[in-house]
Amino acid sequence: MSLTRLLIRDFRNIETADLALSPGFNFLVGANGSGKTSMLEAIYTLGHGRAFRSLQIGRVIRHEQEAFVLHGRLQGEERETAIGLTKDKQGDSKVRIDGTDGHKVAELAHLMPMQLITPEGFTLLNGGPKYRRAFLDWGCFHNESGFFTAWSNLKRLLKQRNAALRQVTRYEQLRPWDKELILLAEQISTWRAEYSAGIAADMADTCKQFLPEFSLTFSFQRGWEKETEYAEVLERNFERDRQLTYTAHGPHKADLRIRADGAPVEDTLSRGQLKLLMCALRLAQGEFLTRESGRRCLYLIDDFASELDDERRGLLASRLKATQSQVFVSAISAEHVIDMSDENSKMFTVEKGKITD
């Protein structure tokens, strides 16, 4: 699936843009603040219902406007799909697919699997566990049809349980929540464990190509003791959870621990090496999706030249081309991306929110 057409209206500093896109590489070139990251963010938002630079909707809608509008056309092997997203200052969204309203943002995410690589993406490696849980959950979402419903129900139950912890005095009062919570926790943890085991070889092989000087290991931690049933953990920790007023153990505390030569990667790797590792993990995840489902990711890469020397940029470019996926790359200068260009590429110039090809 590739995005063949993109319409942007009143998003960030882009008043309007109507763009025909390449199914291969699309380069966005312009000075800092020109709007090239805004175009990447518009594509991301069309597939996620939210921006990646700000959760405040007022900052995403163009100044003095009431809403942004995004439309796209997706070309698959057998059919074309029209998609649209409108969001106003109150945060109300309207999702349209093939001319009909009432759809969910999750449907857009399923139609447009994408990988985002930005200068801020180091949080996957040196941020908290929630960023690595999101990495695993992206894979589970695209690999298991029941994952999103189970994950949504888990969040709801945890919120209810945490509220109940402020009121109950005996563990028996929590059993109605815990009965369903335990089933969901075990199912989600099983999916995460299976996904992390399945993608492990892809991550190891890709990381070895990008960082051959390190021995990298990946370890999934489910969020409670390995040999203990979750039901036992919840009951045993009731008094502590009640004092904390939240549930201290469970799938919401899971992590994917990544080590280089036995030490945490954030303590071992330089910024450039961390970016290479981040790129390797995103590539491995996209390639695993293609192999398992036949579907290809869309890659968004902001500030391509940042932290990478010529050799590493060349390696990343060659691996991206090998995926045969659609790729959007922003850069300050065309010189940084010209070697990646071919007869199927498109080069867009971005200046003060105006996008031309």
Swiss-Prot record:
Classification via InterPro entries: DNA-binding_RecF, DNA-binding_RecF_CS, P-loop_NTPase, RecF/RecN/SMC_N, RecF_2
Lineage top rank: taxon: Bacteria
Major localization class: cytoplasm
Gene Ontology molecular function, alphabetical: ATP binding; single-stranded DNA binding
Keyword Membrane: no
GO-annotated biological processes: DNA replication; DNA synthesis involved in DNA repair; double-strand break repair; SOS response
Alphabetical list of Pfam families matching this protein: SMC_N
GO CC, alphabetical: cytoplasm
Keyword field contains Metal-binding: no
Residues engaged in binding ATP: G30, A31, N32, G33, S34, G35, K36, T37
Keywords, alphabetical: ATP-binding, Cytoplasm, DNA damage, DNA repair, DNA replication, DNA-binding, Nucleotide-binding, SOS response
Gene3D superfamilies listed in its UniProt record: P-loop containing nucleotide triphosphate hydrolases, RecF/RecN/SMC, N-terminal domain
UniProt subcellular location: Cytoplasm
Listed NCBIfam families: recf (TIGR00611)
Described function: The RecF protein is involved in DNA metabolism; it is required for DNA replication and normal SOS inducibility. RecF binds preferentially to single-stranded, linear DNA. It also seems to bind ATP.
PANTHER family: DNA REPLICATION AND REPAIR PROTEIN RECF
Family, similarity comment: Belongs to the RecF family.
Protein name in the entry: DNA replication and repair protein RecF
Gene for this chain: recF
